[in-house]
């Protein structure tokens, strides 16, 4: 899980979602693409 000021999709399988006011990226194909804004 990377924590970044600006989260971006890194591949076409990445999805941007918002949970409890926190923007996250989840990726089914590449778990290393997981990110959280903060």
UniProtKB/Swiss-Prot annotation:
Q: Which InterPro entries match?
A: Ribosomal_bL36, Ribosomal_bL36_sp
Q: Which UniProt keywords apply?
A: Ribonucleoprotein, Ribosomal protein
Per the record's keyword annotation, is Plastid included, yes or no? no
Among the record's GO biological process terms, what is one? translation
Gene Ontology cellular component? cytoplasm; ribonucleoprotein complex; ribosome
User: Per its UniProt entry, which superkingdom is the organism in?
Assistant: Bacteria
Q: Name one Pfam family in it.
A: Ribosomal_L36
Q: Which GO terms describe its molecular function?
A: structural constituent of ribosome
Similarity-based family:
Belongs to the bacterial ribosomal protein bL36 family.
Please name the HAMAP family in this protein's record.
Ribosomal_bL36 (MF_00251)
Q: Under what name is this protein listed?
A: Large ribosomal subunit protein bL36A
């Amino acid at each position: 899980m990377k924590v970044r000021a600006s989260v971006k999709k890194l591949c076409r399988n990445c999805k941007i979602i918002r949970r409890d006011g926190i923007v996250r990226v989840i990726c089914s194909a590449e778990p290393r693409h997981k990110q959280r804004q903060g």
